Amino acid sequence: MALLLSLSLLATTISAQQIGTPEIRPRLTTYHCTSANGCTEQNTSVVLDAATHPIHDASNPSVSCTTSNGLNPALCPDKQTCADNCVIDGITDYAAHGVETHGSRLTLTQYRNVNGALSSVSPRVYLVDESDPDEQEYRALSLLAQEFTFTVNVSALPCGMNGALYLSEMSPSGGRSALNPAGASYGTGYCDAQCYVNPWINGEGNINGYGACCNEMDIWEANSRSTGFTPHACLYEPEETEGRGVYECASEDECDSAGENDGICDKWGCGFNPYALGNTEYYGRGQGFEVDTKEPFTVVTQFLTDDGTSTGALTEIRRLYIQNGQVIENAVVSSGADSLTDSLCASTASWFDSYGGMEGMGRALGRGMVLAMSIWNDAGGYMQWLDGGDAGPCNATEGAPEFIEEHTPWTRVVFEDLKWGDIGSTFQAS
């Protein structure tokens, strides 16, 4: 695994109580492509989410700054005291957390064998721009009138698993501030349309229990049995975040704590899952499916605008697959649609328009969004929303984490050759 050492030069100019040991991030080669000049290698790495890092009392490393109920109240009665008391340490062994890279390939593993026992690590990583060695930021992707392409191997993802690749409108700096000098270098700043309440928001103590909300574009949520792509837009204006990326929802209604999809963000979104939309023979394990998930394949997602420019309004999200050198057009579903549009969403996700529809999602894509990749399973719902019932062929119990751990302890996802750029510039096929 290629490694990149972050020397954390910031640590020489700010309190060492906030940044602890250095971070060693794995290199991941990615590519930016243009129609005129082809694809150019990018200087990028990945960083694990800050919550994976040790965050502890500066004077006693054995005391964590979080508990099972959130922040440690003795160390974090307010934001400033929390920042003074708590240290975030770097991670030097990414493989121990289920993350390995080799050139342009990223492998995420759900379980690790620790002293003969399986441990669930469920890593989530973000793409980091390493072009400035002194102050790393996330690589923000602006994808209006552009496409994003990657090769994926989901053959080791059974029912109940989710190997995800998606975009979050988090701050490129990771919310770096006087109270959070670590920033993107240590994986801070995460948010999404689910508005989860976590101990930290932008690397600062979440004293008031707010939810961390932002626009989210799920390019890829999948296992070997089912797949979907889903935009999740939010109703806040960018200036309401004060440049911090995260919108902090403060009330049960705004955060949609009841799960009724009537808060500040569209938690349900408008998804394109071929199985759920009536084409049950398109995606699955074996040569009887148009996309055979027992073998690797390439995924192309195009964000098309009304005028074909990066300043136009998003009108369509189109999907292509490439396998064995052949382009496979996206599934045609029972309605006759083969892409995600406002028209399709009006019939399948009536709430989507009230969150701004395609145009609302497009505004976030135009501003720039951060790439996240993860692997996880679902102890509460067994991932049935993705691959069971009307959404896929999996039965009601085979997605249980304990079943996966017993029968597929090696479960993993491999992402490779991440490329973004002009429409038609990121892939070649007959």
UniProtKB/Swiss-Prot annotation:
It catalyses: Endohydrolysis of (1->4)-beta-D-glucosidic linkages in cellulose, lichenin and cereal beta-D-glucans. Pfam families: Glyco_hydro_7 (PF00840). The keyword Secreted applies. Optimum pH is 5.5. CDD domains: GH7_CBH_EG. GO terms for biological process: cellulose catabolic process; glucan catabolic process. Optimum temperature is 42 degrees Celsius. GO terms for molecular function: cellulase activity. The active site is at residues 216, 221. It is found in: Secreted. Belongs to the glycosyl hydrolase 7 (cellulase C) family. Has endoglucanase activity on substrates containing beta-1,4 glycosidic bonds, like in carboxymethylcellulose (CMC), hydroxyethylcellulose (HEC) and beta-glucan. Involved in the degradation of complex natural cellulosic substrates. PANTHER family: 1,4-BETA-D-GLUCAN CELLOBIOHYDROLASE B, ENDO-BETA-1,4-GLUCANASE CELB. This is Endo-beta-1,4-glucanase celB. It comes from Emericella nidulans (strain FGSC A4 / ATCC 38163 / CBS 112.46 / NRRL 194 / M139). The gene is celB.
